[in-house]
């Protein structure tokens, strides 16, 4: 074979190899799939979970070849088609088998309801909890659970409204419409007060001792009026330099003055304001506020009233299946494409090789699911539950990434998802909501001078605690059936048993200067609170015997607070400048910011422990928002100037969020995912400040690690839960009172006595500074006479090492001077005054032995003759 023939043969082999490689690449055979994927014979990558699952996901079916016959576990239900599903999914009203065999009448007609459940009828396979019967909400598909319920009968200490609603008899003829139909205020005699009471202009009664005490107790402030007291009430609040004081006494940021949005209770921040005009680059909302011009018609409501999104026209007219956009920019109707006429300037509507060619006929156009042919070209589409991941290949949609897709638990399935409920809840098949099983949940809220409760199902409305002064914060230990609240006028935290008669309560914690919010740790039995006056966050045992500052720095206007003892974290809001929401360990460690942008007045926060999210109210932005517990996935639930005029506090239960609005003096409720289904639960309130849901499922049980091995975790003072950052995190740590610190054993406390040492010429003095604050009644007894030397800073040990050498040097110098003195006494000396060095002999020699001096050693004099009399004196 000649050289030219061999060369041609090599070229032919190289060409064949290149064609083989290009073919392999074209079919995707050389495409490398990820470790969690399976590679089809045709090169496509699918998730390993889809291999041998009974569905052909590879177009060539290679994912279902050589599969071992699948057997279901004992805890599974076997569908007629061989599919396996959990047993609990059988006969739950939701078909989970592809053939629907798990919900077939043959399978489900023999189903018997469990204890504490009732059947929805002879022809129904549905069971619901007994507590859902006659609760005012249809839970059976047939509505049978709300039939033959009869009229609600109120108890002897309740009043029956015309609507059938039950309210406390204390609410009758109190000057407020508590029935919401006015029937509790009909035929009322003129109100009278007792001999030791004062009657407000609103007819309500308060103790006579509360009159003219510079604290308005009447809702109309008539007890502190000029006519009653002969003087204006003294306002004790002193606002910082960055804030201004409202006529009603509270402080707000200076920048909120004359911004078009009333922030003071009396609206005094918007009085005598100059007329506002927007800049040329701004858009003026209908309410007069200004936003940047670029925010108009951006698809987001930036104006509170939404006027920036009114009358917006779609700029892009080529959206939708009936439009075609030319490459030259024109937009034409799809019917004009491939009609053999020039409708685009560049003829892009008439490509000869592409018109009326059905690409879907060849290999389904390369689409993994659905191929849709069009006049020019084609497009791939996916079946329900799938989405395009590379314009041709369909992948499963993880619907569970949407927090509101399921009420509680979401399980992602191939092409779909399954919703389930947490323990203690059961799904209402009519609504898909996970509803609590057991006692009726209720809302408990403060109303300044009393604490009230309203049932969320039967709407029973009663008074729990009365004759209070100025209640601002509220929480509960539900397992112990105890309420806790803070009274800003009495500067204390109180408690009462929820089953006790109205009026019986005990002072637990005193000297709380200006409590803003409280949060009860129901597992470790402690209470946390924010204090706006001292700018601190504190923690104490529920009996108030032990307490301490958890944080007393970097706080400006601490407001709401919430705890999660199951994970060991505490969360709080701060509306100071800059406003923020923070989180930290409940032991005071691992402090970090959670929300720092687009936040101005975060008044109330609450935790959704089931969905692991934090919700908060912004009174300045009139907004209800949420984030996950790491500060990610932020969502706006509701933005409303009407229902969020001045929101103060909120709470969450099931799929609903409830909040108090101070300006509207009402309690509202809405869907926690969408903000829809708005409803008014209570109105005509009097300075309501805080609200909670009362139900055993609100506070899930957890292990108190401080009582697991030894009492109080072996701690001398407080035992606090540690943040569970990872599996190696400690369960708890010991903590000491203010002015004390933990010893090396991590359990015992010792006084933090600071030793300050300073030096002077010829002398050294030590001053001991003892702690001056932090000890409270009930704290540990540590004798202050025992001083402590704190751990020396780096380098101090070296100074102690050379101290003996310095003492030896001083002794040598002293001996030398004594010898010189003896020598001078035995010889004559002459002293010549040098006109140049006019210094006295007292300045001739200076020996500085101070530890902190810049120069250590001798300073030699300018005169050679030295007198030692002064040195030895």
UniProtKB/Swiss-Prot annotation:
Keyword set, alphabetical order: Cholesterol metabolism, Coated pit, Disulfide bond, EGF-like domain, Endocytosis, Glycoprotein, Isopeptide bond, Lipid metabolism, Lipid transport, Membrane, Receptor, Repeat, Signal, Steroid metabolism, Sterol metabolism, Transmembrane, Transmembrane helix, Transport, Ubl conjugation, VLDL
Tissue specificity: Abundant in heart, muscle, and adipose tissue.
Region of interest (Clustered O-linked oligosaccharides), ranges: 751-790
Signal peptide range: 1-27
GO cellular component: apical plasma membrane; clathrin-coated pit; glutamatergic synapse; receptor complex; very-low-density lipoprotein particle
Annotated localization: Membrane; Membrane, Clathrin-coated pit
CDD domains cross-referenced by the UniProt entry: EGF_CA, LDLa
PTM characteristics: Ubiquitinated at Lys-839 by MYLIP leading to degradation.
Name the UniProt record assigns to this protein: Very low-density lipoprotein receptor
Source organism (scientific name): Oryctolagus cuniculus (Rabbit)
Glycan attachment points: 151, 765, 781
InterPro entries referenced in this protein's UniProt entry, alphabetically: 6-blade_b-propeller_TolB-like, EGF-like_Ca-bd_dom, EGF-like_dom, EGF-type_Asp/Asn_hydroxyl_site, EGF_Ca-bd_CS, Growth_fac_rcpt_cys_sf, LDL_receptor-like_sf, LDLR-related
Gene3D superfamilies associated with the record: Laminin, Low-density Lipoprotein Receptor, TolB, C-terminal domain
Sequence ranges on the Cytoplasmic membrane side: 820-873
Record motif Endocytosis signal, residues: 832-837
GO biological process terms held by the UniProt record: cholesterol metabolic process; dendrite morphogenesis; glycoprotein transport; lipid transport; positive regulation of dendrite development; receptor-mediated endocytosis; regulation of synapse assembly; ventral spinal cord development
């Amino acid at each position: 074979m000649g050289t030219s023939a061999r060369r041609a043969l090599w070229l032919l082999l190289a060409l064949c190899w290149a064609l083989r490689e290009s073919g392999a690449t074209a079919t995707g055979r050389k495409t490398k799939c990820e470790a969690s994927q399976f590679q089809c014979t045709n090169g496509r990558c699918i998730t390993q979970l889809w291999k041998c699952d009974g569905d052909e996901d590879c177009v060539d079916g290679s994912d279902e070849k050589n599969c071992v016959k699948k057997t279901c576990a004992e805890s599974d239900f076997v569908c007629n088609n061989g599919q396996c599903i959990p047993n609990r999914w059988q006969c739950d009203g939701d078909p989970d088998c592809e053939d629907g065999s798990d919900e077939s009448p043959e399978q489900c007609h023999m189903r018997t309801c469990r204890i504490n459940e009732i059947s929805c009828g002879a022809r129904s396979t549905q069971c619901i909890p007994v507590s859902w019967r006659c609760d005012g909400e249809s839970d059976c598909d047939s509505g049978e659970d709300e039939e033959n319920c009869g009229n609600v009968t109120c108890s002897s200490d309740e009043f029956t409204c015309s609507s059938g609603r039950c309210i406390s008899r204390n609410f009758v003829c109190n000057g407020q419409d508590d029935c919401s139909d006015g029937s509790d205020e009909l035929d009322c005699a003129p109100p009278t007060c007792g001999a030791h009471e004062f009657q407000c202009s609103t007819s309500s009664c308060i103790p006579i001792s509360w009159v003219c005490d510079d604290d308005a107790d009447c809702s109309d402030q008539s007890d502190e009026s000029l006519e009653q007291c002969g003087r204006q009430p003294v306002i004790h609040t002193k606002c910082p330099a960055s804030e201004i004081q409202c006529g009603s006494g509270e402080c707000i940021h200076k920048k909120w003055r004359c911004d078009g949005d009333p922030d003071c209770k009396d609206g005094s921040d918007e009085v005598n304001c100059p007329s506002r005009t927007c800049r040329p680059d701004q858009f003026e909302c209908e309410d007069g506020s200004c936003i940047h011009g670029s925010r108009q018609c951006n698809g987001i409501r930036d104006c509170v009233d939404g006027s920036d999104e009114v009358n917006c026209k779609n700029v892009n007219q080529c959206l939708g299946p009936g439009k075609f956009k030319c490459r030259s920019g024109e937009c034409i109707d799809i019917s004009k494409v491939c009609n053999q006429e020039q409708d685009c300037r560049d003829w892009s509507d008439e490509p000869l090789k592409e018109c009326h060619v059905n690409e879907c006929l060849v290999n389904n156009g390369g689409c993994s699911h659905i191929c849709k042919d069009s006049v020019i070209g084609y497009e791939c589409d996916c079946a329900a539950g799938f989405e395009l991941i590379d314009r041709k290949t369909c992948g499963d949609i993880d619907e569970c990434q949407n927090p509101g897709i399921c009420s509680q638990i979401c399980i992602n399935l191939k092409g779909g998802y399954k919703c389930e409920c947490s323990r203690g809840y059961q799904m209402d098949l009519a609504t898909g909501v996970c509803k609590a099983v057991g006692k009726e949940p209720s809302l408990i809220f403060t109303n300044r001078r009393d604490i009230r409760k309203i049932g969320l199902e039967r709407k029973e409305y009663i008074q729990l605690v009365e004759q209070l002064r100025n209640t601002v914060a509220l929480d509960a230990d539900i397992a112990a059936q105890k309420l806790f609240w803070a009274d800003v006028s009495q500067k204390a935290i109180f408690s009462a048993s929820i089953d006790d008669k109205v009026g019986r309560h005990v002072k637990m914690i005193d000297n709380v200067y200006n409590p803003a919010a409280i949060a009860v740790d129901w597992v470790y039995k402690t209470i946390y609170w924010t204090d706006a006056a001292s700018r601190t966050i504190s923690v104490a045992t529920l009996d108030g015997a032990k307490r301490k500052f958890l944080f007393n720095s970097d706080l400006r206007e601490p407001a709401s607070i919430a705890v999660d003892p199951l994970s060991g974290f505490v969360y709080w809001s701060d509306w100071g400048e800059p406003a923020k929401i923070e989180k930290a360990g409940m032991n005071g460690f691992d402090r970090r910011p959670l929300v720092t942008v687009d936040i101005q007045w975060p008044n109330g926060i609450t935790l959704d422990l089931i969905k692991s999210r934090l919700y908060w109210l912004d009174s300045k932005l009139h907004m209800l928002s949420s984030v996950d517990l790491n500060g990610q996935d932020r969502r706006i639930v509701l933005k409303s100037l009407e229902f969020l005029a001045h929101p103060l506090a909120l709470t969450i239960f099931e799929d609903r969020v409830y909040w108090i609005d101070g300006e509207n003096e009402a309690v509202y409720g809405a869907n926690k995912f969408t903000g829809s289904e708005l409803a008014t639960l209570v109105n005509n309130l009097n300075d309501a400040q805080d609200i909670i849901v009362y139900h055993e499922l609100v506070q899930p049980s957890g292990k108190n690690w401080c009582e697991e091995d030894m009492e109080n975790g072996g701690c001398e003072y407080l035992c606090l839960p540690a943040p569970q950052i990872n599996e190696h995190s400690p369960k708890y740590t010991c903590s000491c009172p203010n002015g004390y610190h933990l010893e090396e054993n991590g359990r015992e406390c010792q006084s933090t006595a600071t030793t300050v040492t300073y030096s002077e010429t010829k002398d050294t003095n030590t001053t001991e500074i003892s702690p001056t604050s932090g000890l409270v009644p009930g704290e540990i007894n540590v004798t202050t006479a025992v001083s402590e030397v704190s751990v020396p800073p780096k380098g101090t040990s070296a100074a102690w090492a050379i101290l003996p050498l310095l003492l030896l040097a001083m002794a040598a110098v002293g001996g030398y001077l004594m010898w010189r003195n003896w020598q001078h006494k035995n010889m004559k000396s002459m002293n010549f005054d040098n006109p140049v060095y006019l210094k006295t002999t007292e300045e001739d020699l200076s020996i500085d032995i101070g530890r902190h001096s810049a120069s250590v050693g001798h300073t030699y004099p300018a005169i050679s003759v030295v007198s030692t009399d002064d040195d030895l004196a």
